[in-house]
Every structure is written in structure tokens, then in C-alpha cells.
Amino acid sequence: MYCRVFTHFSLYRLYTLSDNININKTNHNKSIGLHQHRVNYMPRSMTASSSQLKRIETRIESLSESLSKSNARKPLGKFQLNTFDNNKITKLQNEKVRPSKSSHIPVKSPIRKKGHSPAQVLQNERMDTKLLLQKLPSASRHMTLDDFEIGKVLGKGKLGKVYCVKHKTSGYIAALKVMAKKDLIDLKLEKNFRREIEIQSNLIHPKISRLYGFFYDHKNVYLILEYSIHGELYHHLKVQRRFNDATASHYIYQVALALDYLHTKHIIHRDIKPENILLSTDNCIKLSDFGWSVKSSPSSSTKRLTICGTLDYLPPEMIESNEHDYTVDIWSLGILCYEFLVGKPPFEEIDKNSTYKRIAKVDLKIPSFLSSEATDLILRLLQKSPKKRITLAEVMNHPWIMNNQQYWPNEN
């Protein structure tokens, strides 16, 4: 029954959100209004993204203006990631994180092995909500905050907070992202927020984080998200500085699997980076954050123009304001591979304008300690011409991947 509730209620809330937001513009305040109980569960965080309500895709006015003055890793839009604070994880015993041999964080996972199917979202943005209402179970129409026990804060961001929660009826542990409607309205995020939910709620893959549904009240919107016990991969990379070949190849292979699934579904992620990769048990990754994602067939002649993502991961075609397609994810996979092995993105500079120039020229400097096979894969991924970039199938069958598989942990 719990599965059905989460499958259906998100679809109904999805298509009534924008109307509700417009009606209640004067009824918001900045307070989240959550009462925290003493429940110690640890899920993870998610984020939203930005776009104009009047147009599906609008260009960002200026790359320089959209970035902060520092060289911090921030998205180009008007939103900010909610980060999972890995240092605040309650350290229990039993299970261990194994990003590499140099780091072990003992934790015990309360997550259930089997998840629940997300909502099947219709492609058309408009639909008859009255007809849908007749098909929904009554419980899904009245989901409220009272249905959950609220635990500790897992992350904070410009748009809200992520809490650890337990569904009272089922006992299911999840993450609850809380965003104020007023902030969504002020930042003109309603439509992009809706598109993000439409995309992610319809994705079912072991390497992609699940969105189970969402509900709202007069002040806030609540996203119910999959629990990932070890948080963002970025935090593990910061602690270890860089991953060894066995660990990095395992992660790259899994991200390639996730991207292959997305591209088959005609979805471009457009924001691949360590912050958007979550770590579950047995070194299993979960690709998350679909705020910049769009539907766009790889075989289609339709190209995108929106500049989006994170500066260090932008491909040359975006830097030069050219059209782009699904191959931007291939480029980002190359940046990701380099950062895993070296500890920083390949074109990172203190001055962002210098970063722009290095990306445009593909001014790639390969450290001498990288293996020849890893170097070959990175060079094949980071081709300036999108047509020359290696395919995901070739990535997964590359010698660097194949030769390191024997060192990967067994996944249950």
C-alpha cells in the first residue's frame, strides 16, 4: 500500500502545484515551520534548478555575472545545491564505506533493500486533474507533514533544507527536501521545478536516485527522495584527495551506465559532477539532481542553447555559445574521470576567465602519474568536437575499465 501511495500522489500534486503557487503568493513567510523530533536517520539531499516560467529554455545573461566572484564550485544558475554534510554522519558500527583502501567510515544502514516505483508521469504538461483525482486513493490526496517523523537536518541550501524522515505508517526511511513556495516564486523556478519532477519521477534504474513523490501545504513544497547512506561522492573525494584506478574506474563505469539509460530515454543530464553523485552501499553510486535535465533525443536534429551546469564541467560548445546535445554528458564524464584520478578538474584556474579560455582551447595537462590507459580514455572523452567524443558503449568497454574490473567490490 505504501508503494501505491507514493506512486500516485506525486502525479496529482505535480499538475496542481503551479496553480496552488500562484493562488497563495501572499500567504508565505520564510519560516520552514518544521518541528524536529529526536529520530536519528540519515538520508541524503537533493536540489532544484532555475529557469524562466514564460519560456522553457532561456539563456543566462552572462556567464561572468552568474558565477560568484570566488572560484567555488557553484552552479551557474540562481540556485544552490543542498550539500550532504558527511562529517555529521552518526558513526555506528558494522558496514563500512569503501571508496578506496585509505578511507573507512563505519556506518549502519537502516535503508530497505527494495524501493518503491515512482510515479508514471504523462508527457503532456496539461491534463485533466479531475479525472486523475477519481483514480487516486484517498490517502494520496491528503499526504501531509504529519505522516512523517522528522529527524536531523542533512543539508541546507538557498531553496531550503533536507531532513531525515521516517514514514510513520510504513516505517520507510527517506530524505525530505523542504522548499518554501515563496522562494520558488521569487526565483521564478516553478516551471523548471515541475520539469525536474516530471523527469526524475519517471526514472527507474539502479544507478539513478529515486524520486518517490511530493506534496505541499500552504507554505512549502516537500520532495520525498531516496536514501543514500554515504552522501555525496564529492565529500569522499575531498577526504581522499584522489581515487585509485580501481575505485575511479568503478565509479565511471556506473555513471556511464546511468547516462546510457538516460540517453536511451532521450534525457540529457547536463550537470554531471561529484556533488551530484551519491554513494550507497557496496560502492554503488546513484546519479542525482535533475535540475538542469531536459528531454532531447540523441538522434534528433534539435539542439539546445541554454548555458547551464558548473563552470569547471562546461564543454567548449557551451563556452562558445554554440548549440549542444547529449554529448555534453560525454564531455562531463571525461572531466569527472580526470577529477577522480587527479583530485581537481582539468581546466580549473583561480581566474574564471582563464578557465573559460582553457576549456575553449581544450588546454589539457595530463599528470605523469596517470596510467596510459586512463590517459587514453580521458583524451577520447575530452574532444572539442562533440562528434569525435567516444560513445558510452566504448567507455564501458575501454581497456582501463575492463582491466580494473577484477578489483571492484561485488555488488549485492
UniProtKB/Swiss-Prot annotation:
EC identifiers of the protein: 2.7.11.1
Active-site annotation: 271 (proton acceptor)
Limits of the Protein kinase domain: 148-401
Subcellular location: Nucleus; Cytoplasm, Cytoskeleton, Spindle; Chromosome, Centromere, Kinetochore
Xref: SUPFAM superfamilies: Protein kinase-like (PK-like)
Region of interest (Disordered), ranges: 94-119
Entries under Pfam families matching the protein: Pkinase
InterPro entries cross-referenced by the UniProt entry: Aur-like, Kinase-like_dom_sf, Prot_kinase_dom, Ser/Thr_kinase_AS
Catalytic activity: L-seryl-[protein] + ATP = O-phospho-L-seryl-[protein] + ADP + H(+); L-threonyl-[protein] + ATP = O-phospho-L-threonyl-[protein] + ADP + H(+)
GO molecular function: ATP binding; protein serine kinase activity; protein serine/threonine kinase activity
Statement: the UniProt record of this protein carries the keyword Nucleotide-binding: yes
Keyword annotations from UniProtKB, A to Z: ATP-binding, Cell cycle, Centromere, Chromosome, Chromosome partition, Cytoplasm, Cytoskeleton, Kinase, Kinetochore, Nucleotide-binding, Nucleus, Serine/threonine-protein kinase, Transferase
Positions of ATP binding: 154-162, 177
Gene Ontology biological process terms in this record: chromosome segregation
Gene Ontology cellular-component terms listed: cytoplasm; kinetochore; nucleus; spindle
Recorded family membership: Belongs to the protein kinase superfamily. Ser/Thr protein kinase family. Aurora subfamily.
Function: Component of the chromosomal passenger complex (CPC), a complex that acts as a key regulator of chromosome segregation and cytokinesis. Has a role in error-correction of aberrent kinetochore-microtubule attachments to ensure that sister kinetochores become bioriented and connect to opposite poles by promoting spindle assembly checkpoint signaling.
Descriptive protein name: Aurora kinase
